Amino acid sequence: MSIYYNVFWTASQAENAPLYKRKLQKGINNFVFTAYNTIVEEITITQNGFDGLYMSYLYGKVRERFSFLPAECGLEKQGERTEIAFKTDGEYCPYVRKFLQEHIADVIAIGYKYEFFKRRLSLPLLSGEQKRLLLTALVAADYREDRAYVAKRLCGFEEYCLDGVFHFRLQELKRRWENIADYVPTDMTESSVDGFIEFLVDDGEGKLYIKNGKAYDADYRLLSRSLLTGVQSPIGEVLLGGAEQVYCFGEVDDRTRAFLKKYYAAKAVFC
């Protein structure tokens, strides 16, 4: 917590995604279950409230990752409740569950946390863009620790209820977020935001690539976690990726270029 005290408290003294209708498809890849002796299992994810962004994100991820499996995957919204149902051969379910737990952890450690700070912090002296940068940086600062903590709390579930897990099994995490928010002064200024982002950049590790407006990790996997903050962008991916160096190929939009030149300087390479 001393990080937030040093950066914010000291500085302050100086100054949808669209929802899908239920569409239970006969196999993600148009496969059908033909092995009658196969034990089919169902993995269910539910959420009450919110605008469906997180569930649409998870639905897209699981469909894309397991498109090769004989499976059924559906997304349904009924009033305030949204449900994802994934059915496949029982032998594949441990792999699907592990994948979903990792991405549910992303939803909470990024999406829920961003929304938490957005509601908790007013920050009247910051522009909309500066506030978005700060909120994303706050999420990124403890992203790996938060994600690991959430993933552990998801083990052993037959069904995953996002809001239920968040409100009843992650109270310690919520208290940590409250403590962080208490260190952020209402009169936060742009220079304080700059100082915090510069601190994160100095503490970064590894590499991240941007090619034609899309971000990739060190293993060249396409990144889309910033979508969980409501807007997918290279800048969001850079902050959430926690990279020490950024390599850019092809066209780079003016906003991303300005961000990298300001905060990364020589650590950003334009090829």
Give the residues covered by each predicted segment.
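C-terminal structured domains
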Residues: 218-271
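Short amphipathic alpha-helical segments
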Residues: 1-4, 25, 31-35, 263-271
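Conserved mixed alpha/beta catalytic, RNA-binding, or beta-rich assembly cores of soluble enzyme
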Residues: 11-232, 236-238
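Hydrophobic beta-strand segments of well-ordered beta-sheets in folded domains
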Residues: 3-8, 43, 206-208, 242-249, ...
